[in-house]
Design a protein with these regions (language model features):
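Helix-loop-beta hinge of the Bergerat
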Residues: 4-37
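Glycine-rich phosphate-binding loop
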Residues: 105-121
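Flexible, glycine-/charge-rich segments associated with ATP-binding catalytic modules
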Residues: 1-9, 118-144
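Glycine-rich/acidic phosphate-handling loop/turn and adjacent ATP-lid/helix
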Residues: 79-109
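Conserved polar catalytic motif of the HATPase_c/GHKL fold
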Residues: 48, 52
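ATP-lid-like helix-loop hinge signature
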Residues: 53-74, 82
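Conserved short strand/loop->alpha-helix "switch" segment adjacent to the catalytic nucleotide/phosphoryl-transfer site
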Residues: 26-47, 106-108
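Solvent-exposed beta-strand sheet faces enriched in polar/charged residues
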Residues: 12, 71-73, 82-84, 127, ...
Length: 144
């Protein structure tokens, strides 16, 4: 399942790295002239997944020494990204998010990010490879 990337970025597992991730995604989307919709979905999904890794994959005491790798590959008619970390095992495909609340008063903050990722990504694949979590997301590109 390993992705042969055309681009990659290594991030420290720190919230401050999200800005660098967002700039990287923006640069790639502009360079490859990806449609605005795909660029927005890609940015939202990567921000959500990497935020979850930063928040939950590593103990707080070792977080600043931990890393997250993101690989990007454009393979028309799709874009693929692979997110890799060596945190605690977590299969987002097995995670069942809570149903959205029916009223604003009943709603809770958090827990909706993976729902967005599932909605926006055309395909999600996860595997645990030794001590690594690997999540691949694909996004369909419109036909010209």
């Amino acid at each position: 399942m390993s992705l042969e990337p055309s681009e990659h970025i290594a991030l420290r597992a720190e919230v401050s790295e999200l800005e660098r991730l967002n700039r990287w995604v923006e640069r790639l989307c502009e360079y490859h002239e990806l449609p605005e919709r795909v660029a927005l979905q890609l940015d939202i999904c990567l921000t959500e997944v990497v935020t979850n890794i930063i928040s939950y994959a590593y103990p707080e005491t070792t977080r600043s020494m931990s890393a997250v790798a993101v690989r990007f590959a454009l393979r028309r008619p799709e874009v693929a990204v692979e997110i890799e970390d060596h945190g605690v095992p977590f299969d987002p495909l097995a995670y069942i998010p809570a149903q959205p609340a029916s009223t604003l008063e009943d709603s809770q903050v958090g827990g909706h990010g993976l729902r967005l990722v599932r909605k926006f990504a055309g395909e999600m694949r996860y595997r645990r490879d030794g001590s690594f979590n690997r999540l691949r997301l694909t996004f369909a590109l419109p036909r010209h």
